[in-house]
Amino acid sequence: MSASAATGVFVLSLSAIPVTYIFNHLAAQHDSWTIVGVAALILLLVALLARVLVRRKPPRDPLFYVYAVFGFTSVVNLIIGLEQDGIIDGFMTHYLREGEPYLNTAYGHMICYWDGSVHYLMYLVMVAAIAWEESYRTIGLYWVGSIIMSIVVFVPGNIVGKYGTRICPAFFLSIPYTCLPVWAGFRIYNQPSENYNYPSKVLQEAQAKALLRRPFDLVLVLCLFLATGFCLFRGLIALDCPAELCRLYTQFQEPYLKDPAAYPKIQMLAYMFYSVPYFVIALYGLVVPGCSWMPDITLVHAGGLAQAQFSHIGASLHARTAYVYRVPEEAKIFFLALNIAYGVLPQLLAYRCTYNPEFFLRTKADEKLE
């Protein structure tokens, strides 16, 4: 493959601009099932066009076509976000009203912007890596965590929230959106990991240091304990814990947790059942040397938390959220400090495990014992 293939995918993704404009005007004249059929046909056509771009030298990695299609949908989501803000008009108006009305929520708005910016850049980078036959495992694992977190919250939230009675045929487009990232995740994980050629002496010296002799790791451990408590606390609020502290926190700090759209509740439950076990495992990995799986799981979790906190913070403050559920003006500084710190912690841990992995690598002696 050549660099021109990656450029072709970029141009193909930009074709979403005229396509959405035409699609919006045609959709106004047809029923919901026809709209779904046409949307599915467009996505299939994008995949076929991506295949045409590389017909002379097809990529070895079939995920090239997945990223090409998802890059197209990312531009669509960016268009949706811009239209919701009134910056553009006439591109997805009918679809937002009749196809997926839950995208009009504050949470839907935020994930559109995240997908249209962060995910879009990731797709372009991964397509370029495939074109140049380079490894993209690190950014791929980060993307897997990000997109799966959005699926885990957004799809169930559409069903159990206030829009559950307005599920339209377009909801079935979520099926490939859910299945493809899972398949992609397994393929990315099974790619060869980066080879670290550290001398055995360097690994032994790094792994001989106790936690107290690793100040940055010690700070991470303390922060992980605090983050675990924070996750459990907000998870209890999502489960309607009647404790006075939970009631006061909801009333004066994060009333958005009670939003009937249900996305914040599901997000807090995802933190409780996804992040808390991860924090426990990460604590073990920071104390016991040779946990070679640490870099991978920290990347996946960091991607998930980045997406989740961006969407949660944005939706909590967004004008589309009812005033009674928005963060009070006097609580904004504390709310932002707390939630940004919670979102930054996994990024720091992922950075530490990825770029200074000596403590987590197995020595040759350990490999021989296995």
UniProtKB/Swiss-Prot annotation:
Keyword Transmembrane helix: yes
Membrane spanning residue stretches: 3-23, 34-54, 62-82, 110-130, 139-159, 166-186, 218-238, 268-288, 331-351
Membrane topology qualifier: Multi-pass membrane protein
Subcellular locations according to the entry: Lysosome membrane
Top-rank taxon, per record: Eukaryota
Amino-acid biosynthesis found in the keyword field: no
Pfam families: EBP
UniProt keyword annotations, A-Z: Lysosome, Membrane, Repeat, Transmembrane, Transmembrane helix
Coiled coil feature spans: none
CDD domains attached to this UniProt entry: TM6SF1-like
InterPro entries: EXPERA (IPR033118), TM6SF1-like (IPR047195)
Role: May function as sterol isomerase.
Family: Belongs to the TM6SF family.
Protein name: Transmembrane 6 superfamily member 1
